[in-house]
């Protein structure tokens, strides 16, 4: 996608803004022509789409990214980012590579420690929310709220703490409250 997105600024410096989206679109068409299976094509498309997305090298940010993608995707993403870094200018290359290494270490820690990054990892479930008086869509919304609280380090993944967190942060859409 870079050739199609190439621009030169007033200082004569080349830029390839938003090339990842053009590249993903092109890859999607090429992968269809090659008759690559849908799961592999989707995976490749997402890698290309995400490869220019800069994840801050914090545990919270890596945890959030891992909640959206699985561990293998994160590691492949980092390899693509590493290759992309080598394809760029030398400017701050070592710092960028060190940051990618740090993100990989954080991802491995999160995986090894079995940290909570999915609803099924929570120490609370739909039955607990039913007992708290939640029903229907509110159960899923409450669990999502709890997961985001754990990922963002606002609450520990402990049943009673999660119940309290949900109670104090959930905005019910009751007919009486409208």
Features from the language model and the residues they span:
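Conserved, hydrophobic alpha-helical core segments of structured domains
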Residues: 1-85, 91-94, 177
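Charged substrate- and nucleic-acid-binding regions of tRNA-handling and nucleotidyl-transfer enzymes
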Residues: 27-33, 88-178
């Amino acid at each position: 996608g870079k050739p199609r997105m190439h621009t030169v600024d007033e200082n004569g410096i080349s830029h390839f803004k938003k090339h990842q989206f053009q590249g993903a679109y092109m890859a999607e068409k090429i992968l269809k022509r090659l008759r690559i299976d849908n799961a592999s094509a989707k995976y490749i498309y997402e890698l290309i789409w995400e490869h220019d997305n800069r994840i801050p090298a914090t545990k919270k940010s890596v945890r959030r990214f891992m909640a959206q993608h699985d561990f293998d995707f994160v590691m492949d993403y980092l390899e693509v980012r590493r290759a992309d870094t080598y394809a760029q200018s030398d400017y701050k290359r070592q710092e960028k590579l060190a940051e990618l290494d740090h993100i990989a270490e954080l991802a491995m820690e999160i995986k090894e420690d079995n940290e909570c990054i999915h609803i099924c990892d929570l120490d609370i479930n739909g039955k607990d929310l039913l007992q708290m008086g939640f029903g229907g869509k509110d159960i899923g919304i409450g669990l999502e709220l709890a997961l985001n609280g754990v990922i963002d380090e606002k609450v520990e993944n402990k049943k009673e703490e999660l119940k309290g967190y949900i109670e104090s942060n959930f905005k019910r859409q009751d007919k009486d409250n409208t």
